[in-house]
């Protein structure tokens, strides 16, 4: 697992992102996507939902990027979960505005099969930017949102949890 600072990232805008996306989409449709997962401390299902996908994406030659605001990923948890520790990159201790920008840049590069970002509520413009970046980079982007950011006025939301034991 590699931990990177925001100021020492290896985001490079190369032709790889566009050419790789074009080569992998024979039907002319983009394959990238953005999805949001809302979780809380009492529902551990997100791990069971995400792990098989993350394990499969870990078999690609590309990296798995975790943009985490405060936590540091546990190397032991990564190993026990069957994730390729050598392909996991983590950026931590960045504010949410920088996280949106970092996620967009990472998705665009095509160097990451998946980018997980812990983000606050996004504007439609931010969502569109991330969706386009995921499509161009042929990558999956998961917007992770703690339940505390849910507005109760909008009714009940299905929620998922990432256990704090995933971090150390």
Swiss-Prot record:
Residues 161-168 are annotated as: Lon protease binding. The record marks 168 as: Essential for degradation by Lon protease. InterPro entries: Cell_div_suppressor_SulA (IPR004596), P-loop_NTPase (IPR027417), SulA_CellDiv_inhibitor (IPR050356), SulA_enterobact (IPR047696). Keywords: Cell cycle, Cell division, DNA damage, Septation, SOS response. It holds the Pfam family SulA. Residues 106-112 are annotated as: FtsZ binding. It comes from the Bacteria. One of its GO terms (biological process) is division septum assembly. SUPFAM superfamilies: P-loop containing nucleoside triphosphate hydrolases (SSF52540). Belongs to the SulA family. Component of the SOS system and an inhibitor of cell division. Accumulation of SulA causes rapid cessation of cell division and the appearance of long, non-septate filaments. In the presence of GTP, binds a polymerization-competent form of FtsZ in a 1:1 ratio, thus inhibiting FtsZ polymerization and therefore preventing it from participating in the assembly of the Z ring. This mechanism prevents the premature segregation of damaged DNA to daughter cells during cell division. Interacts with FtsZ. PANTHER family: BLR3025 PROTEIN-RELATED, CELL DIVISION INHIBITOR SULA. This is Cell division inhibitor SulA. The gene is sulA.
